[in-house]
Amino acid sequence: RRREEAGNIERRIAVVNPEAVGRGAQFLVGIEVEREQRDLVEKLRRWIRSEPSIQQAYYVTGSADYVLVITATDIAAFDRLMSELMAANPNVRRFTTNVVMSSVKRGLYVPVD
């Protein structure tokens, strides 16, 4: 309770097994944007935040500008989502996809001293 009041705990959640709820297809997607123009980047971020299939999203360094963790019912659903991404965000230059073969560790636990 004290950690919640201090703002250390953002929210309480349940970690759901994606396979158990029919979302067993999981993907790690790297997105590269054309330009770091503020309004275009914010449009992409709004789209990412509004899409329920995107579980996590990170602005990163390296070859990609963003890395997304995505769940889907199958490859076809993922393909539709990526088509929507490209249509809604012309500033996206390209994306790369890693298909998750199996989950080694899943959670949002942060060690606290």
Residue ranges and their predicted role:
Residues 1-113:
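A compositional/biophysical signature of low hydrophobicity enriched in polar/charged and small residues
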